[in-house]
Amino acid sequence: ATSVTARSHAGRMVGDVFPWVAATARRGYADLQLTGELEGSLDAVVSCLPHKASAECVASLLADGVPVVDTSADFRIRDLATYREWYGEHPAPEWIPSAVYGLSEFYREDLRSTRIVANPGCHAIAAELAIGPAFNANLVEREVIVDSKTGVSGASRNVRRQTGGSCSPETSI
């Protein structure tokens, strides 16, 4: 069985929150009700919680043997001092060593045997897929600068209705 949880939309149907789901080949998912908590036996979990909240939630799932794909930065950053600088104390540092960076094009074999996939962010995926083959063939220097842009609603920013729908852009390009 498939279940979908949500904080702010618990009790609503997936198709009501995400109308595009009903218009795709995944129509059956539109009728799933969003729940506030995970229910029943779990084969795997994809966590889309914010940084820190994800590690707090998935630590017990991992301890119970449930495979997890985590989309936050919680298991991507292997150095605890760096993580602490950006997010504060890590809620589940004991799981960091077993996490595999989830870019299947480069880490396919490692991903087959891990219980926790540290899913890369969109900018990292774009950069690594573009320049990864050149790195692997030793065609470029090992240190590069990637200048990547996102829309103002990217990086988990929430739209503020009181500002006309914009998020919090610092400056323009």
Identify the residue ranges that each predicted region occupies:
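N-terminal Rossmann-like NAD(P) cofactor-binding subdomain of oxidoreductases
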Residues: 1-172
